[in-house]
Each structure stands twice: as structure tokens, then as C-alpha cells.
A protein has these predicted regions:
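Membrane-interface helix/loop caps of multi-pass membrane proteins
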Residues: 1-198
Length: 198
């Protein structure tokens, strides 16, 4: 096992990322034999959770603490430049070939940049799986927003857990948080289903 970016590098993780990418691409291409391809996004979330938690725990163990400023700045430098580049290029394309969507695009852009696109879609009752009509051009950045919110909150939660309970309870804390998140997701799904059928 090699070392990459200061943490233990596991080649199989890159393999899982490749599987997730292929699954998502095939899903969006409408391949009928892989209807659950969108779950590749969930796989990305699991991988990110594992990698970031390992990174944070290794940093705490090696330095005796966690520099939140360095962590947040590293995440910003990693995510924001390509996101802004994509938005700028898309805005040019929109202005030339789809000017009728410019207002909606400019309204959505700040929520995409500042990591709130998922909540903006919820607020506007926008169904990601809606097949009719033209979806918002930045709708896909909801997953990036979820990841950004995880980056923001998880280090704080981890520090609190370590301070008051110790390292041994981290797996239990992660399971509890996952269970709560799963219950919340299920409740939201039932609510959306009820709305769609009413």
C-alpha cells in the first residue's frame, strides 16, 4: 500500500470511483439494464466520507489536533476553481445558445458556488428525477453541495466526539449519524411521493 497526499493510499478506492463514474454515466444515458446507476453518487459519498475521516484522524494523531483553517482552505482550493470554471463556460454557452434560460441560470449560480444547491432545489420543490421539461442547468451540483456541507460539519462533529468521548466511539457516532440521516431521507422520500401522487 503506497502513500498518497500524506495518507495511506488504497488503489481499490480508485477502482470504486471508476465503477461509480461508469454507473452514473450509464444511468444518464438511459441504459435500461442499469436503472440503479444513480446510486454511484451514493458510492462517491461513502468514499469521500471514508477518505476525509481518515485524513482528519491521521492529522489529529500526527499533530495532536486539527487545523480547521488549513482543512477548509484545502477543500476550497480543490473544489471551487473547477466549479467556477464550469459555471463561467456554461454561462457563455447559455448566453449564446439558450438566452431564455439566462435568468434562471444566474439565479441558481450563487447557490451552486456557495454549496447550497441541494436546499435551493428542495425550496423550489424541484424533483431531480423529473423527466418532463428542461431541468435547471446547474441542478447536478446538488451532490457537490452535499459534499461541501459534509466538509463543513463533519470535522466539527469529529472534534466534539473526540474531545468528550474519545476515539473509540467514532464508529458508533458515525453509525448513529448515518441512521438519523437515513431516517430523514426516508421521511423526505415519503413526503415527495405523497406530493407527486396527490
Amino acid at each position: 500500500v503506497a502513500t498518497k497526499r500524506g495518507i495511506q493510499y488504497i488503489p481499490a478506492i480508485d477502482g470504486l470511483r471508476a465503477v461509480a463514474v461508469i454507473a452514473v454515466i450509464l444511468y444518464h444515458l438511459g441504459i435500461s439494464w442499469i436503472p440503479g446507476g444513480f446510486l454511484g453518487v451514493d458510492l462517491f459519498f461513502v468514499i469521500s466520507g471514508y477518505v476525509i475521516t481518515r485524513l482528519l484522524l491521521d492529522s489529529i494523531q500526527e499533530r495532536g489536533g486539527l487545523d480547521l483553517r488549513d482543512f477548509y482552505m484545502a477543500r476550497i482550493r480543490r473544489l471551487l476553481p473547477p466549479l467556477i470554471f464550469m459555471i463561467v463556460v456554461t454561462s457563455i454557452v447559455v448566453g449564446i445558445w439558450a438566452p431564455d434560460t439566462t435568468k434562471k441560470f444566474l439565479t441558481d449560480a450563487p447557490f451552486s458556488i456557495f454549496g447550497g444547491m441541494n436546499w435551493w432545489l428542495v425550496f423550489n420543490e424541484q424533483d431531480y428525477f423529473e423527466s418532463s421539461g428542461r431541468p435547471p442547468l446547474l441542478q447536478h451540483t446538488w451532490s457537490l453541495a452535499v459534499e461541501a456541507q459534509f466538509y463543513l460539519l463533519w470535522p466539527l462533529i469529529l472534534l466534539v466526539v473526540l474531545k468528550y468521548f474519545g476515539k473509540k466511539v467514532i464508529p458508533a457516532a458515525a453509525l448513529i449519524i448515518a441512521a438519523i440521516s437515513g431516517i430523514a431521507l426516508m421521511l423526505v422520500s415519503f413526503q415527495l411521493d405523497a406530493t407527486n401522487t396527490s
